[in-house]
Amino acid sequence: MIKFETDSNGEGVEIIFDSNGIDEFIAYLQSIKKENDHLHLLVGNELSEEKVSDNENTNVKHVKIVYLPRSWIRWTSFAN
């Protein structure tokens, strides 16, 4: 299980994993780094819709994870 929620005031994000979910998430991160790419995680596919607590958090329905190589970050910082 991989789950992203906004906290009750909408200013923070909570990321919740079970044992399999954290392994999947690490694999996603390794893959986008290796491929110099990005990844979309969607509710109903990679992201769980399961309610895991009684708090007032809101499910995040879409997460985009982007890898920016260090050289790109230095270049854009220098250009600005």
Indicate residue ranges for each PLM-predicted region.
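Positively charged, low-complexity terminal tracts
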Residues: 1-80
